Amino acid sequence: MSLDSEDLKVTFFPPLYHQRRIWLLETLRRERITEIIDIGCGEGSLLATLCQPAPWLGPGSSQDDDHYLSSLFDNIGCSDEDTPNLHPKRIAGVDISSCDLNVATECTSPASANPLYMRWEPLEVELWKGSIDVINPALINVECVVATELIEHLTEDILIHVAPIVLGVYRPRLFLITTPSYTFNARWSPPGTRKPGGHPDPTGRTDRVFRHPDHKFEWTVEEFAQWCMTIAHQWGYVVDIGGVGTAQQKDPWGRDKILGGATQVASFKRMDDRVSTGKRERGSLAVHSATNTKGPHELVKRYYYEAHPRAGNPSDLREIGEAMVEKFEQWGETILRIEELWFADDVPILCGGSIEVMINAAERHQRLDLQRIPGRRRGDWKIELVGGVQRRLMDWSPVQLKSEAEIVTMEDDEPEYGMERSSFDSGVHIGNHDDNTWCSEDTNWSQVGGWADEAHLDWGRQ
């Protein structure tokens, strides 16, 4: 079989770096993580994403002590508790590059926040300069550490310290890591051949050709799995290994299942039994003595995002209900989605940032009928105005209606920070490992601006 290079083009949809980010954010949301440390944060694209506020308070955040709220979603098949928004309280980034950290300082600044998004929860942001093979006491016992597209850039003398420091000293509940799959590289050429181009192993240890000139290694599926299982056993963790990034095109030789995903991912969860805890305690003593030759990390910047002054302090339920009725009358609508009402002017402020309070108010108001939709998230539930519209405001106009009914979504329209495209790569970026995209609960790829562009992976294209 003879195929030219055009036939072997490989594309991903969504782009590979988006798929990595989606896996990461979905895992953080599923585990309800509130503290995230990004080692090798680069220019801070992940941190900038995490700085975006959730649209409402997390479950149990409201100061309303009505027991009705706590039981409101019992026995509901699908709600935001099943696929929650992220509610980070503290995020931090670590990197060795002053230049990259300068960019991260700008994109995580409260001054860069979108004023359209109300913030209902405070957030602390830290940026540290230092090598990842140096222990930072401020990161010990963090909840989650992430390392996306990082380890392949590390020399062997630094790589050997990653697991001992992260798993043995920092001891996060969750450690998430991604790295390119060398196994998948075969997808760019016919079996038994290798295209010219690419980047030869700079260490000379192998005859492999890598996706990026700065990569010190690229592991096969078996090599990555072996490394993950070894360090998980050594430090008392259980690991789940997988992959993301399947080519849109079918492989002419039927290798798709064998080659797997373009990016390898692993999720390490800490085990807290006596044996596992003992492993970490004993091992961390040796780690401290072996990594004290370099200077300590330097705190480059610390930001505090303040919550809205009304957060957790809702108004009277009747006042909230009347405000919602007013919106129905003003817009001339009889049925609205919960999200449509939530993003309407002062409604979230009256609710103190709690969507549970808003739903409670709708349940109790005689002119509002809450319509739960089985299998749908709360934002898609509907509220009907009982009796229909009885009046309209005198100053109503179609232009005003469109403006006031506009829904603010969590889809990010911020530009990517310093994103560069390298040959034979769909998103490996030194110092800026991924895009800046918030992962919402329901993502319609056909409607996300810019995501429909194919991410072409041409080995020789710059």
Name the predicted role of every residue range.
Residues 32-42:
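Conserved class I S-adenosyl-L-methionine
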Residues 2-30:
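Class I SAM-dependent methyltransferase Rossmann-like catalytic core
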Residues 100:
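Conserved short alpha-helix immediately C-terminal to the canonical SAM/SAH-binding motif I
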Residues 43-86:
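Conserved SAM-binding loop of SAM-dependent methyltransferases across substrates and taxa
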Residues 150-153:
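Hydrophobic adenine-recognition pocket in adenosine-nucleotide-binding enzymes
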Residues 146:
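A conserved beta-strand element that flanks and buttresses the S-adenosyl-L-methionine
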Residues 71-77, 83-86, 103-142, 155-358, ...:
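S-adenosyl-L-methionine-dependent methyltransferase catalytic module, highlighting the catalytic core
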